[in-house]
Amino acid sequence: MDERAALELVGGLVSRAGDDAAVVGDTALTIDMLHDATDFPSGTTRYTAGWRSVGASLSDVAATGATATAAVAAYGAPGFDDDELAAFVTGARDVCTAVGAEYVGGDLDGHSEFTVATAAIGDADHRVTRSGARPGDSVVVTGSLGRSAAAMALFDAGDTERANDLFQFMPRVAAGRVLGAHATAMMDASDGLARSLHQLAAASDCGMAVDSGRLPVADALAEVTADPVERAVSFGGDFELVAAVPPERVEAARAAVPGSLSVVGRVTAAADGVRLDGDALADDGWTH
């Protein structure tokens, strides 16, 4: 059973599962796990690992429209090197500070492989799920896509300094809070835009039609691959927000969202499926 099948199994047993974070009362809550072999390529600093792992949970909270307030991390490693542990905690603390949240500690454990489990909470005054998109809505994306794909290419090429910089994504907490007031459905693109579109379509019982010419592809990605659009769509690891917004609210959302907000397509009927430039888009993306 792969990760996707496992998630479907759990979703069939837990009725409230299926969104980026659970909302209990007025609190959003999420948990994530990352491993050395699947999430941290050779050359990833412990600072970047701290930033990225805690950032992933902050991003999940943001995807519900909640305001992230705090995060914790459990750090497992074969040994506890002073400099590595300090760098990890500093990265975790810094990403929280960057979005107005607080890093409040965690746990340590001896582990055969460097492994991190993180959790974050937030205030959920207004909840957005994956299941509210309707035909006619605009599909929007924050920021740019492909930073992580570019980082992986740079790690492979030995340019670890630049790769680590690209790997330190900014969780869209501020954007999620204001975009959530306009969106009918929203999630983050941690597993890739293609996968996110398929998940939103399935949850909302609709289709998605996206125009490659409208995609906000990161400049760094065009420098390292001959097909930046394909990588930006299918690679994942970017943690931008993908949302459905009624067309009459797009300009208000764009004016309110910090940073860029790109309209990349529209929500269609379920029978149309998920399409890129009119062609069926494969359900590809990051798999742990």
Swiss-Prot record:
One of its GO terms (molecular function) is ATP binding. It holds the Pfam family AIRS. It is an enzyme of class 2 (transferase). Mg(2+) 1 binds at residues 32, 107. Mg(2+) 2 binds at residues 32, 60. Mg(2+) 5 binds at residue 191. Substrate binds at residues 39, 286. Keywords: ATP-binding, Kinase, Magnesium, Metal-binding, Nucleotide-binding, Thiamine biosynthesis, Transferase. ATP binds at residues 106-107, 130, 190. Pathway: Cofactor biosynthesis; thiamine diphosphate biosynthesis; thiamine diphosphate from thiamine phosphate: step 1/1. It comes from the Archaea. It catalyses: thiamine phosphate + ATP = thiamine diphosphate + ADP. Reaction mechanism of ThiL seems to utilize a direct, inline transfer of the gamma-phosphate of ATP to TMP rather than a phosphorylated enzyme intermediate. Catalyzes the ATP-dependent phosphorylation of thiamine-monophosphate (TMP) to form thiamine-pyrophosphate (TPP), the active form of vitamin B1. This is Thiamine-monophosphate kinase. It comes from Halobacterium salinarum (strain ATCC 700922 / JCM 11081 / NRC-1) (Halobacterium halobium). The gene is thiL.
